């Protein structure tokens, strides 16, 4: 009835290959020294001593330094990144030359980088996921000395400008494996207008309230004149890996335990039983592929759906195309006593080379993280602003994208994904196992009572993948 452990591992490997998929002013340490001599009325001022770098690279040595960077982006994102590369090459004071190359998606980037590391033909920077950096850790440069450098680093105020959930994702056991490039999250989308018509004045704050509203939506469709929508309403089931992870955390669970994984926990059992029970009550359903999810939410086929931050523009367009003026918003995943939001995304990762090239690479990375550059990324991608100060430059964007602005307000509640190299394959297993739980054709007799067996199988498979 369940997929065997070996099949899980094999499927994870196949999916990884096939799946195609996010300048601060240098801080000068100033020491004022009283002027010797003088009178009591004299102004005791002194020219601040210039900051000096501890990185053992003369400024002149940076001129002409070549930095190659591989990234996963294509289309508009790739064009924007290339324009920023061109701008940096034109304007940077050191004469550094950056060359960008797209690998098409994260899966291909990982494979190409993995191969390049074997024959020492790798770039200086890659835009990869934090778990990728942990997989390559013997080649990855610890960025902490660059961040803390008196001349070329970042001040405490600059670092605190990054929300902790964004900044801390790349640090493991005191080593900084990267700095954030893009961050997103998975949200529950909620049709407020329809909910009010169903008698609910506020969004669900708990899982029980979520169930109550989802079942009310299903009941309403079953009682209208259109018999074709009788199976619909409620939550439109989604099996993106961050969806089950968010549900588990909302119920007090999670997946990482020290340097490994643990799926079979009371919180995870409660989370999986909750969503499976919703399906058994017909208050949650799996959509066919003939109509996109945004169109279904806009057509009131579901009261709740789940989507990532970058999907919000598509959802807004779907409501517009449908001439649907319903109000909708984004929510965290509700549990019994808390809600959950999982923040994830890509990072700039530096590989070992020589002192000059590494400093040149860092200076480009630091430049990309400026608030002004982040504005362009947000406007193009719809993802989170990496810095709090960026929001001050996005007033017009916030006004015209209200659901995005609401999502940003939830960022302080965010949590990170597991900081383990094996997460890149374990998340594929989690996604597949969660999807399989809702497959009533393969498993017509599967009930919420069998959830512990599913989670035990995930434990066993994750142990294999983590070793």
Report residues per predicted region.
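Extracytoplasmic "Venus flytrap"/periplasmic binding protein-like
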Residues: 87, 91-161, 196-199, 295-296, ...
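Conserved C-terminal helix/tail region of periplasmic/extracytoplasmic solute-binding proteins
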Residues: 38, 196, 412-467
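Extracytoplasmic/periplasmic solute-binding protein
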Residues: 172-181, 186, 211-261, 302
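Extracytoplasmic/periplasmic substrate-recognition and gating elements
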Residues: 196-198, 269, 277-284, 319-386, ...
